[in-house]
Swiss-Prot record:
The keyword Transferase applies. The keyword Cytoplasm applies. Pfam families: AA_kinase (PF00696). This is Acetylglutamate kinase. Substrate binds at residues 89-90, 111, 217. Pathway: Amino-acid biosynthesis; L-arginine biosynthesis; N(2)-acetyl-L-ornithine from L-glutamate: step 2/4. It comes from the Bacteria. It catalyses: N-acetyl-L-glutamate + ATP = N-acetyl-L-glutamyl 5-phosphate + ADP.
Length: 322
């Protein structure tokens, strides 16, 4: 399907031009009306489409932000958009690991996961975090169902291994065993399409099964990206604890091409947890027809601001030059 072009840069601003004088100088009325009128082209464009939302960070741990997120998700559903929520929960996992004095090691934003850590990850993500998010959305008036990748073979994973050079002089690559860390390999889209048609909102924990009935801890960004491609989603939205993608001087980049995003990874400007996020966004816009957004989850109702206003709030990754 070809989407109409109503990007931030292509919307005709004259179509929504209003003046404060028309509202008797009432700035509040002006701002409310302006925002609502700006949203119409986006609502018309995306009605019936699927949005994959990766939820994590401060938006999850702060009660008021969590409630505003839940209300935004329900509003999307009411507008005819089909949101699918994929969540992380790293802070809560760290909290439980600290109770047993266990430290975590991360490689390129991925947690090395042994058997003991995997047990904690599955307990926290599937049994605690997932159900809390589901309840919040239901409390806001939605019909959310909590799942993990293992349910109905929703997401099949395969083991991840990293190669690295121990010594630059001999140029010999070694394999780093990440433990029970996987990446998405296959998606059961039938279940998700059924849930969309039944007006349910899937909330997915990134704990998946793989070969030989093994369980894998899969990075939530990677799961969200795989779902976006499998479901031909119009948008992938990743909530973070930063304003978006920044350049080497710390300035926010509001719109980012695939080539620019790849350069930020290669030159080290993007690092730690931003690496899998940008890699996921690049993969999605290369293989799909939608766009990917990295936005600041610390802002109340940031989903609505990014999706339904002219200027947005974070970084949009698109498959074209800027």
């Amino acid at each position: 399907m070809k989407l109409r072009n109503v990007s931030k840069n292509n919307l005709n601003k004259e179509d929504t031009k209003l003046s404060i004088e028309q509202f008797g100088g009432n700035v509040e009325w002006f701002n409310i009306t302006k925002t609502l009128s700006e949203s119409l082209p986006y609502i018309q464009q995306f009605s019936g489409e699927t949005f994959i939302i990766k939820y994590g960070g401060a938006a999850m741990t702060d009660k008021k932000l969590a409630e505003s997120f839940a209300h935004d998700v329900v509003l999307l559903k009411q507008l005819g958009i089909n949101p699918i929520v994929v969540h992380g929960g790293g802070n809560k996992i760290n909290e439980f690991l600290e109770k047993i004095n266990k430290k975590s090691t991360f490689i390129n934003g991925l947690r090395i996961t042994d058997a003991e850590t995997l047990e904690i990850v599955e307990m926290v993500l599937c049994g605690l975090v997932n159900k809390n998010i589901t309840q919040l959305i239901n409390n806001a008036g939605g019909n959310a169902i909590g799942l993990c990748g293992k349910d109905a073979n929703l997401i099949e994973a395969k083991k991840i291994c990293y190669t690295y050079k121990e010594n630059q002089s001999n140029n010999v690559e070694k394999i780093l065993d990440m433990g029970f860390v996987g990446e998405p390999h296959d998606i059961n889209t039938d279940l998700l399409f059924f849930m969309e048609e039944s007006d349910f909102i899937p909330v997915i924990a990134p704990v998946c099964s793989g070969e030989n009935n093994l369980t894998y801890n899969v990075n939530a960004d990677l799961v969200a990206g795989a779902l976006a491609n499998a479901m031909a989603a119009a948008k992938l939205i990743i909530l973070t604890n930063v304003s978006g993608v920044t350049d080497s001087n710390g300035n926010l980049i509001s719109e980012l091409s695939v080539s620019h995003a790849e350069n930020l990874i290669d030159n080290g400007t993007a690092h730690t947890g931003m690496i899998p996020k940008l890699q996921t966004c690049v993969r999605v816009v290369k293989e799909g027809y939608g766009s990917a957004h990295i936005i600041d989850g610390r802002i109340p109702h940031v989903l609505l601001l990014e999706l339904f206003t002219i200027h947005g709030t974070g970084t949009m990754v698109v498959n074209s030059g800027v």
